Amino acid sequence: MMVESASETIRSAPSGQNGVGSLSAQADGGGGAGTAGTAPAAGRDASGREAASGGADSNGEMSPAELLHFQQQQALQVARQFLLQQASSLNSPGNNDSKQSASAVQVPVSVAMMSQQMLTPQQMQQILSPPQLQALLQQQQALMLQQLQEYYKKQQEQLHLQLLTQQQAGKQQPKEALGNKQLAFQQQLLQMQQLQQQHLLNLQRQGLVSLQPSQASGPLQALPQAVCPTDLPQLWKGEGAPGQPAEDSGRQEGLDLASTAVTATSFASPPKVSPPLSHHPLPNGQPTVLTSRRDSSSHEETPSSHPLYGHGECKWPGCETLCEDLGQFIKHLNTEHALDDRSTAQCRVQMQVVQQLEIQLAKESERLQAMMAHLHMRPSEPKPFSQPVTVSADPFPDGLVHPPTSAAAPVTPLRPPGLGSASLHSGGPARRRSNDKFCSPISSELAQNHEFYKNADVRPPFTYASLIRQAILETPDRQLTLNEIYNWFTRMFAYFRRNTATWKNAVRHNLSLHKCFVRVENVKGAVWTVDEREYQKRRPPKMTGSPTLVKNMISGLSYGALNASYQAALAESSFPLLSNPGMLNPGSASSLLPLSQEDLGVPGEPLPSNGSSSPPRLSPPQYSHQIQVKEEPAEAEEDRRPGPPLGAPNPSTVGPPEDRDLEEDLGGEDMPSQPCPLIPGWKPSLLHLSYCVKPKFTVSVGSKTPSSPLPPPPRVQGSYSLPPCSYLAYGDMRGQNPAPSPGLLSGVGGGLFRCLHRTKSPSLPGVWILAAELETMRFHRPPMGDPQPKTADWV
């Protein structure tokens, strides 16, 4: 039946010649036996088709080889007509409009190769075997590429010749007309190249050719590849008219040359290549023809690995749907995560995640730079948050302080030494618990970013105490059991839901630590409530609770410095090592800690010492010199808080330990260093300059007798950054007889110091200035209730 339909299709061609030719004669000569030599080309073609039809009628069937040869002859004739029409239209560019209207058939070569009289693709698949179909496609592809290459070369030669002739004749023509013609020729050449590239990309999309990177912009040199029989309809439907409806192109089984509207000479706009029809049915049941363009664009944008697909599951925030392959994931992405309100809200949440991670990245980078600068003894230069960095950081560590997104200055700026007290409290590091009071309340923060914290694996930037209080306050009766508090944490935050449940220990620790949480026994068992008074009491920053806060809050208060005579004594005993910048790093010379009224003592209060009394201090305005100490990064106060140096324990430092895993101390500020006075004549060895830990110790300077006419200098307490393993100690020598001699003495904190050099102050009678070297490295805070270290024991 298929052969009869093919014979009827071939017989429909016009016939006007006599004689019957054999199939072999038609294959060899391409014409009929009775064709006259003077007959036109159209007559020869018609007689050849009539001979083929007569042979088909006589024999009853057509072999695949004969059908293939017949198809090649038709394609060659149509291609020749197309090339002749293109050449004639380009020879007279001024008459392009009339030529276009008069031209009967002007289509791309790949479309012109298929005619009405060819068999349908389904008939070709039934007649020819798969190897024969592959051979047919390869031959057609090779022929088409050869035709395109020849046509491309001819067009280039003709355009160059026309440009040369126009340039020679341009001396007599107006320059504007010449420029317009040259521009038109260049546009034609460019559009021809674009047309060929689009056609090649269309073939590559269908899998017929493999385009190399070097062949993307040059002449067509691609080699055809073998295709399967299922791709044959896609090859024949490779190009269609841009204005042709998709339903008509999908309904047509063969392409009609007369119905195509694409012309190679109409260069007003380059023809668009229609994408191939997608064979993946959509879940919503829409026909694939209507959505082929959308499907093809989505498949082109989807590489082998998708950012939202990994390890066999969907990485859309909060989805985690298992997908076997990428195709199933694309189907899931188009159905479950379409453009709707939910997806838009999730996208906004992801934007907030990225913004907060960028802020955290800048903060961690600044912290890393400060650490490196401290280890290398170089002053750090923190960058503002607005500058991008390339250092990876874990998102949201415990106790993270969220800086504002519009901050243009770092959190710990360098403060000049002469900064007044007016601008002191406006900056500097602060603890998270005090920062919560001035920031937006936790309830409004959680209400605004509820979806964010519920789906994103990000630690909330609040203390455990604040979160526990919020959980209790959200309930109607303002009380929760421990298990209900756990459930609130896991329900509100994905961080606690997806990570190891070590945070439960912190919750229990906070419930028992803070006095604001009250345990009440009722019928259901033990429940927890919040005492708002106690909670508000712990909100303001404690001046004695954090060394960092103490240093920063008191550094700008009004206080006096050393007496003029005491300054002269220190100036006379300057150490040459620190005055030479080449011997030590810039960061090794220390500054001394500014003193507050608490350190200076209240007027009329004796200076605490080893059982002796001291005269009342003078008022602060009598001191004119400021001494500064380089502040070191604050440590956990419950582990490293030093005890009172001399005398009874200081009640201001005794208290419950802070929640160290919840609240985070920021590093201290780097201040300009000043040389620390040491003793002339003491030359440290290389052992003294080796790197080691610098402990915290106390320096006490006093007068020998209460009746001394000179006022005693203030007591200095703080951390010193001196030459490694070389420490300066001003000993309080009141009541010491005889004078101290070099040897071992015990320092505050349990360490031993070796006295290297001693000298009397030339201005202050009874005051000894000592230089001591660290003997042992055991420095720790004495346990509660233990006796404080004794004062200096001289050997």
From Swiss-Prot:
Tissue expression per record: Expressed in the adult heart, brain, spleen lung, liver, kidney and testes.
Region described as Leucine-zipper: spans on this chain: 354-375
Compositionally biased intervals (Low complexity): 36-45
Biased composition (Polar residues): 1-25, 609-627
Gene3D superfamilies in the cross-refs: 1.20.5.340, Winged helix-like DNA-binding domain superfamily/Winged helix DNA-binding domain (1.10.10.10)
A GO cellular component entry from the record: nucleus
InterPro entries per UniProt: FH_FOXP4 (IPR047414), Fork_head_dom (IPR001766), FOXP (IPR050998), FOXP-CC (IPR032354), TF_fork_head_CS_2 (IPR030456), WH-like_DNA-bd_sf (IPR036388), WH_DNA-bd_sf (IPR036390)
Entry's Gene Ontology BP terms: embryonic foregut morphogenesis; heart development; lung secretory cell differentiation; negative regulation of lung goblet cell differentiation; negative regulation of transcription by RNA polymerase II; regulation of lung goblet cell differentiation
Function: Transcriptional repressor that represses lung-specific expression.
Protein name as catalogued: Forkhead box protein P4
